[in-house]
Amino acid sequence: MMVGGYALPYYGAIRTTLDIDLAVVVRTEEEFGAFSSAAEAAGFMHAVGSFDDHLSMFRASDSGLEVEFWTKLDGVTWDEETLARRTRQQMGGLSIWVISPEDLIVTKLARPDRGVQDEKDVKSVLERLRSSMDREYLLRRAREAGVEALLDVIEGTP
């Protein structure tokens, strides 16, 4: 499932990003090993991370393209509801899964290294989709992630 900067244009502002962030559901060390093997077989070099880490980074060996595979997203509970809310989008002729706008907002706010750009990203999604988002779901997930107060502040700023 596409997350991060590449997911943003589907819901908010278009901006450049240096890497591709993908979230994968990996529930066991065995699944992580199988996923890692498949990524390496597809030409990605495992650069960092293990099953217990939030992030496992793989790089395309021939192009230097950086693809980050997130096995535990900040602020998002991996459950059937999260997966059911993802959306199917088109990207370069491919049909891909993209994180829901509500979950994208929560992941941006729950990052331990959250910066000004993350908050700008959240504002852009809110400006574009505020009336069509599931407000109850967004608030519940923000509360679960401990970022509800921050969301309130961002929503109150121009």
Where are the predicted features?
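Compositionally biased terminal segments of proteins
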Residues: 1-158
